[in-house]
């Protein structure tokens, strides 16, 4: 128990030292830098050319869906690699845990596939057309 706490103590000390180092560098740079804003510095920079149009570019939402699916399975590989390195010593229970983990991710992939999020060009949905009933008032009849 003592060794576990001292190991975590080392991790927390390293984490605290890293945070202090980054925050100290940021604050030192902020205090020492010159601050002379002008319109040229605050404008959009495009390789030395005058900016054309807005800096806000609209991306197709499908790029984000593909990126999120990639990140999910990339993180899966990050979790599976340490498990694979010690697989023999963990036993059957760890194998079942990993199969459940992979199964949940595969179910998510199948759901995205069935929903059509993996199709780049989606087919247009067919909307049923209702027949137009003639207006009897326009024909002079009773309604």
From Swiss-Prot:
One Pfam family matching this protein: Oxidored_q4
Transport is among the record's keywords: yes
GO terms for MF: NADH dehydrogenase (ubiquinone) activity; NADH:ubiquinone reductase (non-electrogenic) activity; quinone binding
Topology in membrane: Multi-pass membrane protein
InterPro entries from the UniProt entry: NAD(P)H_OxRDtase_bac/plastid (IPR023043), NADH_UbQ/plastoQ_OxRdtase_su3 (IPR000440), NDAH_ubi_oxred_su3_sf (IPR038430)
Enzyme nomenclature, EC number: 7.1.1.-
GO CC, any one term: plasma membrane
Catalytic activities: a quinone + NADH + 5 H(+)(in) = a quinol + NAD(+) + 4 H(+)(out)
Alphabetic keyword roster: Cell inner membrane, Cell membrane, Membrane, NAD, Quinone, Translocase, Transmembrane, Transmembrane helix, Transport
Cellular compartment(s): Cell inner membrane
The keyword Transmembrane helix belongs to this UniProt entry's keyword annotation: yes
Major subcellular location class: membrane
Residue ranges crossing the lipid bilayer per the database entry: 8-28, 63-83, 90-110
Complex and partners: NDH-1 is composed of 14 different subunits. Subunits NuoA, H, J, K, L, M, N constitute the membrane sector of the complex.
Function: NDH-1 shuttles electrons from NADH, via FMN and iron-sulfur (Fe-S) centers, to quinones in the respiratory chain. The immediate electron acceptor for the enzyme in this species is believed to be a menaquinone. Couples the redox reaction to proton translocation (for every two electrons transferred, four hydrogen ions are translocated across the cytoplasmic membrane), and thus conserves the redox energy in a proton gradient.
Family: Belongs to the complex I subunit 3 family.
Protein name: NADH-quinone oxidoreductase subunit A
Taxonomic source organism: Chlorobium phaeobacteroides (strain DSM 266 / SMG 266 / 2430)
Gene name of the encoded protein: nuoA
């Amino acid at each position: 128990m003592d060794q576990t706490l001292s190991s975590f103590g080392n991790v927390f000390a390293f984490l605290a030292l890293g945070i202090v180092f980054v925050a100290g560098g940021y604050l030192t740079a902020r205090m020492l830098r010159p601050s002379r804003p002008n319109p040229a510095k605050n404008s959009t920079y495009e390789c030395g050319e005058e900016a054309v149009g807005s800096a806000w570019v609209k991306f197709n939402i499908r790029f984000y869906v593909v990126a999120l699916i990639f990140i999910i399975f990339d993180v899966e590989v990050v979790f599976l690699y340490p498990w694979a390195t010690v697989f023999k010593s963990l036993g059957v229970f760890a194998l079942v845990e990993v199969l459940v983990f992979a199964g949940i991710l595969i179910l998510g992939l199948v759901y995205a596939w069935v929903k059509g999020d993996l199709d780049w060009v989606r087919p247009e949905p067919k909307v049923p057309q209702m027949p137009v009933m003639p207006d009897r008032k326009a024909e002079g009849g009773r309604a």
